[in-house]
Amino acid sequence: YMKKERKINKIPVVAISTFGHCGIDWLHSLIDSHKEVLILPRLSFFRKIDSLKKKSFYLENTLKPNTIVNIIRNIDFFNDKTTRISRSSRILQKNQNKLTFIKYINNFLAAEKELVCEKRLFFAIHYAYAKINKINLNNIKVIVAHEHAPWNCYQYVKHFNSKFVFVVRDPRALVAGSLRGSLK
């Protein structure tokens, strides 16, 4: 008897973020090897969505899965030689097939039509990552999203009703720097 695989969109999402350079990559490294946590290399999902919008690619709920897949090919998270992202930030490693990853994304998008497009894509990318890395979703208790800056964190509340972990170095310096910056 095989237990049915847990639906990824039923797993709670927690976002980690930071105000300034406070060690979020260090926090990420502490979490990423935990067997009950699904965390991608530093994706900053909603920042990527914003960059798509700046290129005039808009994710609509009416888009077909193939169209969404063609749009996300414009996100620079694959291990192409043309992009200048660090090895630790790549979702796919050298031995992993980009077409297989895209197939998993497409399969998820085709199966889960009820979710809002950004939410569908978020879960589709995480689902594909879990599949390509042979991660059993039944063992995952939380999805941790790495958002490098806090500007898009409201999206996690909007789409996932998320909890947050913010890394702040010195709150007094943070407030003083923010006030100084806003007064200029």
Predicted regions and their residues:
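Short coil/loop residues immediately preceding or within conserved phosphate-binding loops
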Residues: 11
